[in-house]
């Protein structure tokens, strides 16, 4: 079973404008809603690739019901804890520039955190948990570490997509995969990286601290894989026009998982991850199976 955990899901309400005039009535040229959140993105892309998952975290109110409905349409099982108040709405205004207004989100009680913990304690070594994203102010800042300590004895396979001290504090729980970008790697180790040799050297520090595999995202230059027992592997991203980078990193994680669950081969999973992340970057929405397969053929 694959489980994705999103602490602070949202509805992204995207409004297209020719021009945003402050202090005046603006007419939209179009608008649409999307279920947002890093773990939710992973579940949606997995569903697009034909892979089932359970999405969990915290949802509330009519906005939470909307997200549950959207996930259900895609065949994604909901394991969310119900909270008081409404799941947040993020407003994204797209015109000559993009302006975002992110909602605050509902209060989460200790009892609701415990309810999530009890659900996660049902996972076993056969399961894979994706834990990702920022920690909202309504949760303890060390919630990642609290969760992983609670389920440590279950030997669940872990993928952690976080940054800074949050990521560093999870490494003792030996995640299967972590996925910083170069800038995040530099910030974690208080250094500047000038070449691939230094990139590999710093990625290996994460291995030494407990990670099994590290993928360093390099934007248009693809990504670097460093893993225990593996030679470092740098793959270029396939060529294409970048339309939207939102969800591209989550899509990389989904592509990696889909192939890893299928074959157990880390290098193949890395390749599919890059293809899947690129497919999302090259489209308005999240990657589809057909888009990913086309890019994989380009990478052969």
Briefly describe each language-model feature range:
Residues 145-230:
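Conserved phosphate/ATP/ADP-binding segment of small-molecule kinases
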Residues 100-102, 126-133, 161, 179-184:
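Short beta-strands and strand-loop turn motifs
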Residues 107-109, 135-139, 166-168, 187, ...:
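Short, small-residue-enriched loops and turns at beta-alpha junctions
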Residues 114-117, 141-148, 194-200, 235-238:
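Charged helix-capping and loop-helix junction motifs
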